[in-house]
């Protein structure tokens, strides 16, 4: 073993430039390999944290020239209730953005600007929210919300966040209430999933109910049998004609394992 090290040192001294180039090449090669491997693994496992991933689909609109994922609320609701093969659905407003919240009172008042997503309660039946404390059913209550664990710890420290109040100092888009009570804390989602780590709270039951112009919502559905997705779309497209834009139709594309 000593002779191997000795020969290695001698080679380095005699061929310094070649040895340096070889070592640098190996470092670069291994760095690139690790980067590609990490990226490949992230793509391969995208949304795989959700146990029902193979049966989850996002509703898209397609024309002869384009395709887009956002929907108007009445339309998404009509589709979600159109087939017995659709076991569950959720409608999400992902564009609320960050909202400034305060906690505490008077001289110990603290403020936090955090992302908010409004949605219908079915989201917790479709996607896997790993509960840390509280209840996922809290989204049935318009006063309550779900927080990611990292946010709960940042705001409330190591004490329980359940029952604590967050007061929005500005309007929450698509939400009537400004005061939210923490009803559940979920484990943070990894980066390779479609869901963001945000405050989830229920969408106002009256928001955009009759609005056929506001294309801001995402609609996800859970199917009992993924092989029926084309039939579901075909039946709905026939029963719900798009006029005057007759070439527009709905589709449920495979969204990388979801």
Where are these regions (language model features)?
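Short, membrane-interfacial amphipathic segments enriched in basic
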Residues: 1-6
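Short, strongly hydrophobic transmembrane alpha-helices
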Residues: 11-43
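Short, cationic motifs built from Arg/Lys/His that form the positively charged side of catalytic pockets
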Residues: 18, 251-254
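Short, hydrophobic secondary-structure boundary micro-motifs
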Residues: 20-21, 89, 258
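Feature marks short, surface-exposed loop/turn motifs that line or immediately flank catalytic pockets
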Residues: 27, 97, 189-190
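Structured, solvent-exposed hinge/loop segments at the ends of secondary-structure elements
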Residues: 33-159, 169-178, 234, 241
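Mid-to-C-terminal secondary-structure elements
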Residues: 119-133, 143-250, 257
């Amino acid at each position: 073993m000593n002779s191997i090290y000795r020969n290695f040192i001698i080679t380095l001294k005699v061929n310094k430039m070649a040895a340096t180039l070889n070592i640098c090449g190996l470092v670069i090669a291994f760095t690139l390999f690790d980067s590609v491997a990490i990226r490949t693994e992230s793509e391969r496992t995208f949304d795989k944290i959700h146990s029902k991933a193979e049966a989850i689909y996002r509703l898209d609109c397609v024309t002869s020239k384009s395709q887009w994922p956002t929907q108007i609320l009445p339309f998404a609701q009509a589709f979600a209730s159109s087939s017995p093969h659709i076991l569950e659905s959720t409608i999400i407003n992902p564009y609320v953005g960050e909202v400034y919240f305060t906690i505490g009172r008077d001289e110990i008042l603290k403020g936090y600007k955090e992302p908010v997503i409004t949605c219908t309660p079915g989201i917790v039946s479709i996607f896997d929210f790993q509960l840390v404390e509280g209840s996922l059913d809290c989204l049935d209550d318009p006063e309550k919300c779900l927080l990611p664990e990292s946010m709960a710890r940042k705001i409330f420290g190591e004490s329980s966040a359940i029952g604590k109040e967050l007061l929005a100092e500005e309007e929450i888009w698509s939400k009537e209430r400004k005061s939210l009570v923490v009803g559940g804390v979920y484990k943070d989602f990894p980066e390779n999933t479609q869901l963001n780590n945000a405050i989830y709270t229920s969408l106002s039951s009256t928001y955009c109910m009759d609005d056929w112009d506001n294309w801001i919502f995402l609609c996800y559905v859970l199917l009992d049998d993924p092989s029926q997705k084309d039939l579901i779309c075909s039946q709905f497209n026939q029963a719900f004609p798009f006029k005057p834009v007759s070439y527009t139709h709905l589709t449920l594309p495979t969204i990388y394992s979801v």
